Amino acid sequence: MSLLDSLKKFFSPSAPTTPAERAAVEPERVRAAQPLLQPRARHVLCSGPHGLHRVAYTEWGEPTNRRVLVCVHGLTRNGRDFDDLARALAGEYRVVCPDVVGRGRSDWLTDKADYGFPVYVADMVTLIARLDVEEVHWVGTSMGGIIGMLLASLAGTPITRLVLNDVGPVITAASLRRIGQYVGRAPRFADPAAAEAYIREVGAPFGALTDAQWRHLTEYSVRRMDDAEGGYAMVYDPGLGEVFRLNPVPVDIDLWPVYEAIRCPTLALRGAESDLLEPATFAAMGARGPRAQTVEFPGVGHAPMLMDAAQIATVREFLLAGA
């Protein structure tokens, strides 16, 4: 060995080579990664037609990472639906999961007629401005996918890669009627077990989730109430149902002009038993507009929860293909 090689060996920290050495180093690596895998609660102040409101969001990953993934939930859900997906992608992205106004930790609007896509899209633009990035990747489930389509169709959009989870350019009237049957309810539950039974009932189309996943969804779907009635209530504004009552939809909603204006790479996901995204619409999404890649998940209705390994892997592969 030359003198130069000897000096390099002496002054350079050696990598662990034996199993015992690697075992000693690994806990330190795990500890260093832990902050990235812990959710951080944040909020942003937004402006609506009748005043200001706060939109809460959960953030994962390195806070200074310029690669940002925004994950937006369905109509009565919240950003904690994406915890499993966020953990899986926190090493590559700063993952941001908002609670759309009226849900989760976000404020409720005083004028219930303001609940709608103009406010939702404006709030997401404000959120992205707060994140201080020019571009984002987007995963949207159901309503979150519609918000994503609307934003991605605009000139100058910040969305450069789009995942549409069980939603497309045609929203069936039948599915909206089904959703309208429960969205305006304000059920109370005596205990978490009763709440979980309800979540399992209305969430039956989500597919075969584990007991732990159902408990997770329940934990973030209800909160303990301190009023006279007590018990547990859903963490969304029952006033969301007023939109359905005031504006009943007798026919399917056609968003093809919006979809065909999208220019970024797009992945469309569908639960094989979905009543919201019909097979013909799903197939056409692969041929029109951004010509989406299409993946269908068996044994699932509306909507895949992106909690199991296969669903997460599908989303991950598509998103990181653009890295």
Question: Model-flagged regions — what are they?
Answer:
Residues 1-69, 91-93, 310, 316-323:
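Alpha/beta-hydrolase fold catalytic core
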Residues 49-51, 84-87, 97-139:
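Active-site loop/oxyanion-hole signature of alpha/beta-hydrolase fold enzymes
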Residues 58-105:
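Conserved HGGG/HGGXW glycine-rich cap/lid loop of the alpha/beta-hydrolase fold
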Residues 99-104, 168, 298-301:
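Short beta-to-alpha linker loops that shape the active-site pocket of alpha/beta-hydrolase fold enzymes
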Residues 134-173:
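Conserved hydrolase catalytic core segment
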Residues 190-249:
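Conserved alpha/beta-hydrolase catalytic His-Asp/Glu region
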Residues 223-284:
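Conserved serine/cysteine hydrolase catalytic core
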Residues 300-309:
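Catalytic histidine-centered segment of alpha/beta-hydrolase-like enzymes
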